[in-house]
């Protein structure tokens, strides 16, 4: 059908594929004709935001992507960094937000499966998983259902496939009601002599389909992930994939065995957009074409048409390009593992994706048109910050009631500082996530150094590897964290995003790890709305600056936009802008690490970093005063670098016995968490002169960057304080000493006026049981 003939589709049919009228006109121009149904579907998924980043690509160009340890940056299935000693780490973060909103168990489970495939497709064995989760208020029954389902899905897939879930974060806020965020990060250690890339090459080389069969599950998942959610989204359950973790375990082993033969030229996971994405991306990256015969594809359902084959997102499937003549060698490996493996196509010289079905051409599209030369929207940025931000920035702590050493009066009732601390510890965002991580197998593979909740970052031991005829013994480990304070980013996307990077690096430094590199997951609302695009643009600017300042290049990641829920009136309610940073760090000696809990009674407690904090954007302000306003703390990167380096070097010198980032809830919450992690009390004296410069609640619960709480053996006090004076000047404070197991957390002024005295038992009850109580378990 020529380009001048009438379109064979109605505007509604075109819109149903996620294609705008002007995009359809561009498709017709490029093809020189109208597309058929299968081709329209292919363009719909490949031109979705989920696949082509048409609104975010110009912003992502700001990110630093190179560095001395970066082996593979953005553009491949996962980033790879050099750990030294012949060890290489692959890592990546991805989202499965929309599927988890309509089918939480399978949505979250297949999110785990998809990110694991990104890792082992590179030739790396998965060694760890982390997750970053966001939900609405835990008092809401719908949130409880989503939360329970997501956690069950993550634990089911990860536990069955045998990869430990070693860390993560969980936030609860009404901003995520109906639109949860499920971001999953995976790490893998390279096992193959060469990193496996995804660009096809070698004209005449066979194209192999391996793994599971193809069905109708996950139809149009990429387009589904690029639209707002509504009450009718439950009807989109067919767009949610169904995973098989036991099959994935076999796929891991078969792929790694196949890669080691040297018979594989390129490999690509069939994730979003399934066969369409894998064929077009492999062809475009290699500057070649791929011809694929759908009649060769193993199916689990009868009567499938090309549109369904091409858009199916059935899980646990891969596409390989093999060296000609060695295809049977690979097929035998997959059959031995009980998996499908067939030659389904060929690499061709013409740079097109040609799909055959029942002896005829079902689709024929230039590969670049699908995977590289896709639409790009450079939107106009607001000339000034939006009104909601300007109003929030006008807030001042002067509007809060007056503080005294006894507490603060809220709505006519005096609340003591002790009561406020217990309330914060009982807040689901701050409280222990033991209800979550007890469902995860976090020790499978026997390389997990810290149990979840025991340190500010996960630490994984690097076991001796057999490769290329030698055994590599090492004391090295990797640390990993996922972080984002979305309230900070909502109130000031630029400063908030910088703070995300700083906190991730700080968490790694608290376990003694040198921050190396970043993978990011950008979760935002609609970029087509001026406020949404302003938030996205400013956050990307902040992330880029933070990564440059802390020398942590970005190796890749994921963009998830249109995270909005339509209310009953049809008005879109966007989530908080949530740029999650996954960061990895290197530990050269696993005997030189520490957790967040106090270790020994009599150890001296110090606060490294700035003493001045703010209540703007704080957990205290949101929880106790029900106010989301103010500006988040501004990041001082010079101080951040110095504080983090002092912490790392203190750990390496065996001076620092515990280290904990002061984050949500401020200093006193950090003190309480260190008491609970070590099951030891503490006696703290806060300088009363500080309260002349700051409100008392700012001193206790204010938040700020570059602040780390550490404990040091009393025998090392003189050496440590000399070191602090040399490297931090006045930017540190001695706070007090660690108590016994039966001691309280006692916070006093320097003239011994009591501010807080609370037992470990009482804190423990609020902190450990907050989530279970709300779930009525």
Curated annotation (Swiss-Prot):
* Transmembrane parts of this sequence: none
Q: Where does Mg(2+) 2 bind?
A: 118, 269
**CDD domains in alphabetical order:** PurL_repeat1, PurL_repeat2
Q: Where does substrate bind?
A: 95-98, 117, 241, 313-315, 560
> What is a single molecular function from GO for this protein?
ATP binding
- The source's superkingdom equals Bacteria
Q: In which pathway does it act?
A: Purine metabolism; IMP biosynthesis via de novo pathway; 5-amino-1-(5-phospho-D-ribosyl)imidazole from N(2)-formyl-N(1)-(5-phospho-D-ribosyl)glycinamide: step 1/2
Where is it found, in Gene Ontology cellular component terms?
cytoplasm
Q: GO biological process: what's one of them? A: 'de novo' IMP biosynthetic process
- Kindly list the places in or outside the cell where this protein is found, as annotated in its UniProt entry: Cytoplasm
Q: Which residues bind Mg(2+) 1?
A: 94, 558
Reply yes or no: does the keyword Magnesium apply.
yes
Report residues binding ATP.
Answer: 53, 92, 520, 557
UniProt keyword annotations, A-Z: ATP-binding, Cytoplasm, Ligase, Magnesium, Metal-binding, Nucleotide-binding, Purine biosynthesis
Can you state which reaction this protein catalyses? N(2)-formyl-N(1)-(5-phospho-beta-D-ribosyl)glycinamide + L-glutamine + ATP + H2O = 2-formamido-N(1)-(5-O-phospho-beta-D-ribosyl)acetamidine + L-glutamate + ADP + phosphate + H(+)
Q: What is its EC number?
A: 6.3.5.3
> Where along the chain is the active site annotated?
50, 96 (proton acceptor)
Q: Give the protein name, as stated in the record.
A: Phosphoribosylformylglycinamidine synthase subunit PurL
The encoding gene is purL
